[in-house]
Amino acid sequence: MQRSAEQHIFVTGACGAGKSTLAKALSHQVQLPLHRLDDDPDFRQMLPEEPWLHRVTDPQLYARWQALRRQMVQEAVRLPQPHIIEGTHILTAPELTTGHRRILVDTPLHQIIRQWLARDRAKYAEDPLRYSARDAGVPGSAVARQRAVCARQIYESLRPELDAFRSLPGVEMVPRRAFTTWLSHQGSERGSGSGLAS
């Protein structure tokens, strides 16, 4: 797909699907700055409350969460020059992506869970005190099973938004296993990029 000079490129998908990996490589490939919605300080501050799990039990918290996610996308759309904009928050405001390039990282749930557990183990190994809540234990342990349940809950909470985004016109579906091949077909209008290493 050709990119016009004014278009942002939105990269979204489930948590742990590979959005950040693809967005970073694509940013390098097409020479556009990367804007990660997860870096927003207000978003980071809400994370410990796990608002995505409280759609029914705390609707006010969930509504604040959704409003914040939508606001972050609105602000990103107004960036003065084209960017690669990456995050699950894009799923809350798909209409704001109209006229821009849309990419959905399409990764099977079992692969997302495996990735999430690996990421939790790496964070915990890096700093056990800071990341004690992310201890994923050893594979097959009760702790690992509990973290896998959490990953599944987050995925299931995003499923309606993922399905709605997937059905939008012009959405490019990029399977995680195909990143390298897909990136090799992305042209660079501002210079040459190397893509993602195999």
What kind of feature is each model-predicted range?
Residues M1-E6:
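Phosphate-binding P-loop
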Residues V11:
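Hydrophobic anchor at the beta1->P-loop junction of P-loop NTPases
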Residues C15:
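The conserved Walker
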Residues G18:
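Conserved glycine(s) of the Walker
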Residues L22:
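Hydrophobic positions on the alpha1 helix immediately C-terminal to the Walker A/P-loop
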Residues H28-R69:
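Conserved substrate/cofactor phosphate-moiety recognition/catalytic segment
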Residues A122-Q186:
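Small-molecule kinase domains that catalyze NTP-dependent phosphoryl transfer to phosphate-bearing small molecules
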